[in-house]
Amino acid sequence: SRLISGNFSELEDLEEFFAKKLEAPSALYYNSGYMANIGVLPVITDRSTTIICDELIHASLRDGIRLSKAKHVVFSHNNISKLEELLLKIEGKKLIVIESVYSMDGDSPDIEEVFNLAEKFGAGVMVDEAHGTGLTGENNLGQAQQFINHPNCVAIVYPLGKSAGLSGAFVVGSKMLKQYLINFSRSFIYTTGPSKQLVIQLRKQLETMMKKDTSFIFALKSQFLNSLSSHYQYITGPYGAVVGLITADKTQNIESALMDDNLFVKAILSPTVQRGMERIRICFHDFNTKNEIDSLLSILNSRV
């Protein structure tokens, strides 16, 4: 545990480096995004808190809510009007929990409007940046970073297993939040700290990620969407690299055809997504090529 013998200067330097890049008061490293989410929510809420969350938040956020003693209610996906209705009805302490980019749909909430409502109704906000980190914003650190010092921002979680390509997560927030987590967050306290080798590599990976030109990823995504058959229904958003191609009962057959052509594209089935919304989840990377996109389109368009 970092509280006994697992702490070292390189790890503290990494936390300070990440916080400084975001112009944030502090950052605390967890071993994974899952451990961050289940570790933070029970600490920042209590029995008098009501958590108001988007219906499509991560399983890790849902588990964190279950581990907390807070009450919780759900609003329909990205529906700001429904969120406002709930905020108007609920008394006492309130915490809004959202993601900057949703993992299955690839779309985003109106984060600015969420913070406006939080300010209006005296609610805190927690944002998960798992699928936004590494793609947009200053230093490729997502869309939520501009709200880090907003008075209603409680925490922003930056998992490192996606764009950074390693493991772990930073919880970014006030210095008081960091001290509370160090002393009360069970998934931080009762686990082995990261190795020095991992921390050194993370620093290198983050420095690389922050300098990357990500426009190529969005160019590939545009190439794909512009050439995809109009018979397909898809879900995506402006800030994510994910496109959810709704394929219902054809999903597994399409996945097999793509895998046979060495295209690693996964089928997402019920109950991960609701019945009738089964899909091929396409995630674009900077190592993908235009030829790979052409192959992907050829197979998909031939199966309309």
Language-model features: locations:
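Conserved N-terminal alpha-helix of the aminotransferase class I/II PLP-enzyme fold
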Residues: 1-32
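Active-site PLP attachment segment
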Residues: 147-180
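Active-site phosphate-binding strand-loop segment of PLP-dependent enzymes
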Residues: 73, 77-127
